Amino acid sequence: MLSTIFGSVCSIDLKIDADDNKKFAFLRKDKKGEKCPIFSDGEDINGTATISLKPGKKFEHYGIKLELIGQINILNDKANSYDFFSISKDLEPPGFLVESKQFKWKFSAVDKQHESYFGTNVQLRYFVRLNIIKGYSGNIQKEIDFIVQNLCIPPEINNTIKMEVGIEDCLHIEFEYDKSKYHLKDVVVGKVYFLLVRIKIKHMELDIIKMETSGVGKNYTTETVTLSKFEIMDGSPIKSECIPVRLYLSGFDLTPTYKNIQNKFSVKYYINLIIVDEEERRYFKKQEIFLWRKKMG
């Protein structure tokens, strides 16, 4: 429960109800702080709002309102805060509070088509805000966050990825991944086949790369982060050698692929195959993969 004290007159508390089966997740990327309940598209959200008055005190206001908001913040553009979703309920008409009050509230079948996201330059957050309207003296507000995750239907078509790449007369390889769409706890299975090897290879690695694009115009930014470096071969291979690939995605901090969310941001993922020779030259081939959510949490 969250609480804020306003002077010596009153304090307010805001709580989202969650049953014993409700899953929770950290709001922050560093997995610190409090965990928040996870909801999905169309699910009801309910809770309580409490205004506690000190004995003998009264409190004038111009209405008490509860709002449920979906908001996108572009962190490198402080002016670019966008509420893509908002619904509100009036809890109390203008007047005086002369005693403490508790309000039970509920938002039914809430449309939550976008997932919560906390990236490098973008935040998509959902929260409930208690708003006590005070006129010229400034409103009193309290917010509490919750997380939205949405399950996906397994893709009907999931083709393998197969490519031949190389450097003329020096290196020619064929690589294959078992599919192009993976759930967040999936395993990437594949192989790398060396058709021609005329350079001395030091090692080969497989990287998972996340690319976040956000903003428009002069505020458009692209952030690329390498989430993992997984060595799959040490030493130089011979012609016709086949190197197996098995990469477990569950060990990485991944989200589903997000495409042009509210025309504000996108998140894509890539598998990057990198070969390093003995002179530290790097040869790579990047291939996009599609990620989707199979389970909550």
Curated annotation (Swiss-Prot):
Keywords: Protein transport, Transport
Organism superkingdom: Eukaryota
GO cellular component, one term: cytosol
Biological process, per Gene Ontology: intracellular protein transport; retrograde transport, endosome to Golgi
Keyword Metal-binding part of the UniProt annotation: no
UniProt-listed InterPro entries: Arrestin-like_C, Vps26-related
A UniProt-annotated Pfam family: Vps26
The keyword Transport appears for this protein: yes
Family in the record: Belongs to the VPS26 family.
Quaternary assembly: Component of the retromer complex, composed of VPS26, VPS29 and VPS35. As part of the retromer complex, interacts with the sorting receptor SORTLR/sortilin. Interacts with GTPase RAB7.
Protein role: Plays a role in vesicular protein sorting. Component of the membrane-associated retromer complex which is essential in endosome-to-Golgi retrograde transport.
Name of the molecule in the record: Vacuolar protein sorting-associated protein 26
Species assigned in the record: Plasmodium falciparum (isolate 3D7)
Lineage: Eukaryota, Sar, Alveolata, Apicomplexa, Aconoidasida
Gene that produces this protein: VPS26
